[in-house]
Amino acid sequence: MMDKGAPRGTRTGFTTGACSAAAARAAVIGLVTGQVPDHVECLLPNGDLVRFAVHDGRVDSASAHAMVIKDAGDDPDCTDKAHLTADVRLLPDLAGQVVLAGGTGVGTVTMPGLGLAVGGPAINPVPRRNIEANVRAVGAALLDEVGLEVAISVPQGEEMAKKTLNARLGILGGISILGTTGIVKPYSTAAYRASVVQGVQVAGTLGHGVVVLTTGGRTEKFVMAEMPELPEPAFVQMGDFLRYAMGAAVKAGIRKVVIGGMVGKLTKIAQGETITHAGRAEVDTGLLADLAAGLGAPPDVCDAIRGNETARYAGERMDALGLGTAFHTALAQRVIQTLRTRYPDQFELKVLVCDFEGRKIAEAP
């Protein structure tokens, strides 16, 4: 189990996939022994064997029910305390088979691009394999004679899903069953990076040949207003993860990439950063000063821009000179130049720039 004495903010938790596998394993034990256990040891995808508390265990001659309450540790996860529930029933005519199904609160896949069957449950590949492995580990004797259907459900999962990107990805009616290791690390960016990649993959299946990458909610709202002809799934909030978004676009064969952002993140992209988090690299104000000088800004303004720490300051000084649009256009052009160097002949590129109120300032080309 997790270390309850870990320093605040560092306690790990378990994924929805791990909890589903534990519930399924407990239910199968119930079918084998006639009693669902109060605790179960479950093998996680990373190879760890972990003990879970089991709730609401029930069993009859042909089915069993078990539930595991998710503990996300110190991660602020909307699925923390979710009831991952497994209902397992015998399939007399399908000896040796384990059939995975989605119940209430588990989303249904409605769009291609996720590596999951359209119309099927949103249970990702690693959790699928892990659930089946745990079922087979304790149900081998049963599977010699019958098959087993394992239905995973999550009460209140549809409400939880409203706090996720599932609807944007075409996953409707509930949450996804996720987890590549079985462990949730507090404030980990892995889940968000994965959602960015999935979003780009879905955009690649829409037939428009374009993905619109934005740095956040305000920039996305701005770009959506600029490009109303595109459906919502064509827009992906990449946050700080340009590298992963662009890599996914290459793999998806997308030929046009539109980037929407504000001066700070765009400056980092222009200077060659592909992870634009504030803690990763400082803004290259020298680059901004050079752009300003190229537009005829006085030397004292260029020196002030170079000596300041923020890109916003540069924009404000250029606005005061009446050169705001030209400055932001030059920055957008530099972003395109940098990305063309990094991804030669891969994409048609466009950059849209907005201010801190979400109003359009400039675009390129």
Curated annotation (Swiss-Prot):
One of its GO terms (molecular function) is cobalt-precorrin-5B C1-methyltransferase activity. It catalyses: Co-precorrin-5B + S-adenosyl-L-methionine = Co-precorrin-6A + S-adenosyl-L-homocysteine. This is Cobalt-precorrin-5B C(1)-methyltransferase. Coiled coil: none annotated. SUPFAM superfamilies: CbiD-like (SSF111342). It comes from Variovorax paradoxus (strain S110). Pathway: Cofactor biosynthesis; adenosylcobalamin biosynthesis; cob(II)yrinate a,c-diamide from sirohydrochlorin (anaerobic route): step 6/10. Belongs to the CbiD family. GO terms for biological process: anaerobic cobalamin biosynthetic process; methylation. The keyword Methyltransferase applies. Disulfide bonds: none annotated. Keywords: Cobalamin biosynthesis, Methyltransferase, S-adenosyl-L-methionine, Transferase. It comes from the Bacteria. Its EC number is 2.1.1.195.
